Amino acid sequence: MNNPIRILLTAALCLLTVHTSFAQQAIQSLAGTWRFALDPENRGTDGCWFNTRLAESVTLPGSCEQNGFGVRAVEPTVGKLTRVVRYEGKAWYQRDFDVPQKWAGKRIELLLERCHWESNVWIDGKSVGTQNSLSAPHLYDLGALSPGRHTLTVCIDNTYKIPIGTWAHAITEDTQGNWNGIVGRIELRATDPVWIRDVQVFEDHLQVKLGNNTGKPVSATVQGSSCSIPAGGISVKLPFAPNAKAWDEFSPALHELDVVLKAGKYGDRKTVTYGLRKLGTKNKQFTVNGRPTLMRGPVDECVYPLTGYPPMDKAAWMRVLSICKSYGFNYMRFHSWCPPEAAFAAADELGFFFQVEIPLWTMDAPHFGQHPERDRFIVDELDRILEAYGNHPSFALMAMGNESAGTLGELVQKGRSADPRRLYRCENGDTEQDGDFFETGQRGIAGPRTDWDRWSAGGWIAGGENDGVNRTTGAPVPTLSHEVGQWAMYPDFDEIDKYTGTLRAYNYEGYRRSLAERGMLDQNKDFARASGLFSVLLYKDEIEASLRTYPHGGFQILEARDYPGQGTAIVGWLDAFWDSKGLIEPKEFRRFCSPTVALLQMPKRVYTCDETFRAVAEISNYGPKNLPVKPEWTLADESGRTIAGGSLPATVAETGKVSGLGEISAPLRTVAEAARLTLTLKAGGTSNSWNIWVYPARQPETPAGVRIAYEYDRTTRDALARGERVLLFSDPTKGLYKIDRVMLGPDEIRLFEVKPGQNALEGTFMPAFWNMRLFNQVGTLGILCDPAHPAFDGFPTEAHSDWQWADLLGRFSAAESFRTAGAPPSYCDEREKTWGDVRNRSKAIVLNGTPDDYRPIVQVIDNYERNYKLGSIFETRVGPGKLLVCAMDLDTDAANRPAARQLKSSLLNYAAGDRFDPQFELPEELLERVLTFEDEK
């Protein structure tokens, strides 16, 4: 704990601290072995099971599933993890406990930290009551119990009786699942019959709830002030003016407050840990203690596969949040669920901001305001969350569920009135209702199914001059970019062995079998790494676009780790266990995601050697203070040779702002050959880098001995029969599958099968968004190639997709994507008129049926649902001839497409050279099927 300060709120403390009545509450843990019975037919209450000694046994804390009780899975679920055993209904938990003699006359409280989700309690066969919360502890006042042995019976019912939405992450089968059990602390706590029920620490006062079980009014003193506590209890407001260090992300100072109650022979003391921080908004930014703050962080979807529920201990959350901080994050959004006390305690200590949400997602549930019983539960849940976790300085933002509908503004008003220590939002992904901040789908990069407003004329901006979220600047309050990312990548099947708990990765096993059946299982690691590295590039660009935006509230990444539900979304550079996949080190990630980041605005990534590279340097500074900077930059090739470099004028980067550093200019005429260059910008103790590609300005010439063809027709086949070398450009607009499925749900999908005349998938630079089960899209995951292959001698590349491939592989038609997503026709028509149709720059030809060890030169990584062998560039012998196939349009507008010209030149030189020596001869039937079309036969 940082800077502990104990503030003792009574003038007579020196006397009170030695009075036994004022000792901290006595606690007895009930963790351990409990008697148990399942009640699938709901007979227990009528059968008085609370008076029956239950026959089975389980260990608590835990769940039915952890203890092996429930219906064992017969068939694996396809679109998510599979619970080994599953149970929905009532389950009975029972144990004996002893009340010590020293507790005689005491009030005893039962705490069940987290139940899933309704609990009913009996003591010695007598009903105590019922509690119903997914977010806060269930607390039962047992009154005074006689010393000696007693029997406690708890019935937990996880039946879906309150329609909060089956997609809500507090219960959804796509994440933790609707488990039955009791986790966290399970304990008895003894107090005097007059006690401190709760203390809330506000900026200038304390709100103290006092309980009184004596049945009559009691005179008491709290903080030296007298009050009368009526039977039942009272809430009192007490003055509070601490003189202590404030809490923030850079200096998370925590303090302890002792509140002491004296009521005659009764008394109590409650110790509260708190942090002093003032959260607000100004100029469309969040402020913490008056300083602008940018929220940067992932979404926690409650994916904890070993237990099926979130960790309840502080050490586990220290690990999770320390990992997040190592990647430069300072914020976490809990998607339609609330974390436990241990998470807040860890965040307080580490200086981390939480966005908590009520358990609501109305996708398949009534809108708020349409279901009175459910609405009462949600209102009560809001109150419970604010009381249980309100003192935590990490608890900064509160949203009313995820992407829900209804009169949610009522909840915002209620939250503001009850607890102004945090900021409130109606729900996520919407800007139409009342809120202290907005969330919107504005993105750094436009993908095939992301937001509608981020598209530029080119389809995306890769480190571009657009800030990436500029459309949010009209909002009157801070705006958070909602669920940025969701770029799919290929799974690494070695992770399957890590699923040893209540949830198993049978979905991954199915994908692995499919890949093996296609003869490509040996490529699993390559697919995972190439698609993963590509995804990291996209995350970098999105994050930087958000950081360039000013003023702005921040961004939430969906997700830093994989989400093995909702159709199976492999989207993280971490796996579902928060373990690194080895795609990027935290130190490298922090170069573009941290409080202070060097940034660059540049109009494009591909240049010719007769151009001058120009860019605008900036720095985003949300550090603790203004930062003197002396910017320096270098432009170097892959060998480290400096092409150009220089310094920019020294300046001071104000905290809470994006500051311009100056313009960078570098003539590229000294770059004689095709090259990838790296621009590195250093400023204020930080550095960041970006790749650009520089190509010769000349048009490629066709070398002798190579025939260029555009159809696999009789002329082409005759040339091959004569032993000629042919570079065939297959029309990327022909032979395509029709992508026409609609959303069927995470456990249903209509996959594409080979049909006559449909032998390729539409090419796209961007990878799949989330997954194919939920969104209509081509679904491919980037490319895989061998950079050392001689076909790339004149076209430098990595093994994975990078920005120089963007123009070659093609981009989704914005208008068509919008139509598929259900956007208004007028909106789509306008976008189509403005931008035109930029699809069909390439296609991915289906090469199923080729030998297992046959590999295309440019292999398109297919979605793990389909696992087709796909190629955009491949080669084969055809009798005595040699055929090189390129399914990319490298000719259209070639004068303005340097990458297209350069790739064509590289392929021509390869086809003319000695190293063009295809090792396979693909069947003529296959070539005719994938390379000929009805109008060419």
Predicted regions and their residues:
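Catalytic beta-strand/loop cores that center a nucleophilic Ser/Cys/Thr
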Residues: 735, 770-898, 916-937
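Aromatic-rich peripheral "rim/lid" segments of glycoside hydrolase catalytic domains that contact
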Residues: 418, 558-622
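Short alpha-beta junction capping motif
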Residues: 704-769, 880, 886, 907-910
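Active-site-adjacent substrate/metal-binding segments within catalytic domains
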Residues: 67-99, 103-123, 129-130, 193-200, ...
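Accessory carbohydrate-binding/adhesion or oligomerization-edge regions at the termini
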Residues: 23-77, 155-160, 907, 927-937
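Beta-strand-rich binding/interaction modules
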Residues: 123, 205-230, 236, 612-651, ...
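Substrate-binding/catalytic cleft of secreted carbohydrate-active enzymes
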Residues: 321-322, 331-574
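Accessory beta-strand-rich segments of carbohydrate-active enzymes
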Residues: 37-40, 83, 88-195, 213, ...
